[in-house]
Amino acid sequence: MDYDRIRPVRFLTGVLKWWRLWPRKESVSTPDWTNWQAYALHVPFTFLFVLLLWLEAIKSRDIQHTADVLLICLTTTALGGKVINIWKYAHVAQGILSEWSTWDLFELRSKQEVDMWRFEHRRFNRVFMFYCLCSAGVIPFIVIQPLFDIPNRLPFWMWTPFDWQQPVLFWYAFIYQATTIPIACACNVTMDAVNWYLMLHLSLCLRMLGQRLSKLQHDDKDLREKFLELIHLHQRLKQQALSIEIFISKSTFTQILVSSLIICFTIYSMQMSPVLQDLPGFAAMMQYLVAMIMQVMLPTIYGNAVIDSANMLTDSMYNSDWPDMNCRMRRLVLMFMVYLNRPVTLKAGGFFHIGLPLFTKTMNQAYSLLALLLNMNQ
């Protein structure tokens, strides 16, 4: 049926192309390491900003100051890892999206399937908009407030080769941060959303496969051909799951590693700062905290959806009209159901299964680190 199967991600890849993080050609089989425009954009902003933040964190001698620096330093470090990852593996994701949008194997063939896609796309768009508001909403509080502070103060602490507290030199550092922060935010939000959409679409394809399996009838014309086509669809989805894991594994693993520290340092900074004396700063930190929690929660939700959709395939096959099929077909059904017992899961870094248990572990680790910091402060 006539429906754009990958509608939400087209906007996201368009944004990534603008920031030189996505192949500009439609069919690319290898990473393009000669993209000098990408280097010219991200080296002076993304990677230099990360370096300056780490230098400030290393030179710090105070726990609270170190926490204030690390909460943004770790975020930008994860961003740098995501940028390198997408430069290396964007062609893999581009190939998968091309298959989903053009191959007849993934064509939507009923109103029920179109409605399912349309509903999930609308919900994904709402989630993405809320995530954008939480992430981008921090920028005005962070960037505008320092303009009214006396003495001068940068949005984030970072090392500079000059004394930025001098009135004239302050503006060089401030303009650099005011330019870098929106760029980092836009790239980070968009790359996260592409990862989430790949997992969402994979779970939708598995649900579509389950619906088609449950509708198989013993008196269907070309029953064997339909069933073999569904087996081929399942095999292709498993291959795509491996490719998606290659694309999202390292970036998700990096995000999981730093998320517990970021959440910990954010809450610690909020507790150590006087709320009534700095309401805009407190509001910014609250939004930042929500965005960081969403950054680790949403991939686990979409990863869990892949696991659940794959696990439901056996039940869907069992709910078909297999008892009335001939012996040869029942034998094929039995072999396929045994094959379905192999789980379809996505891993982060080859270690962690991307699912809701990973989110709870990350939050528990953040709480433990926060308790340790508070005890050290006492």
UniProtKB/Swiss-Prot annotation:
Q: Which InterPro entries match?
A: 7tm6_olfct_rcpt (IPR004117)
User: Which stretches are Cytoplasmic in the membrane topology?
Assistant: 1-37, 88-127, 188-255, 302-343
Q: How does it sit in the membrane?
A: Multi-pass membrane protein
Query: Does the keyword field hold Transmembrane helix?
Result: yes
Where on the tree of life does the source sit, at the highest rank?
Eukaryota
Subcellular localization, as worded in the UniProt entry? Cell membrane
Found, by tissue, as follows: Expressed in olfactory sensory neurons in the maxillary palp.
Q: Print the keywords alphabetically.
A: Cell membrane, Membrane, Olfaction, Receptor, Sensory transduction, Transducer, Transmembrane, Transmembrane helix
Q: Where are the transmembrane segments?
A: 38-58, 67-87, 128-148, 167-187, 256-276, 281-301, 344-364
Disulfide-linked positions: none
Q: How does it assemble?
A: Interacts with Orco. Complexes exist early in the endomembrane system in olfactory sensory neurons (OSNs), coupling these complexes to the conserved ciliary trafficking pathway.
| Entry function | Odorant receptor which mediates acceptance or avoidance behavior, depending on its substrates. The odorant receptor repertoire encodes a large collection of odor stimuli that vary widely in identity, intensity, and duration. May form a complex with Orco to form odorant-sensing units, providing sensitive and prolonged odorant signaling and calcium permeability.
Protein name stated in the entry: Putative odorant receptor 71a
Q: Which organism is it from?
A: Drosophila melanogaster
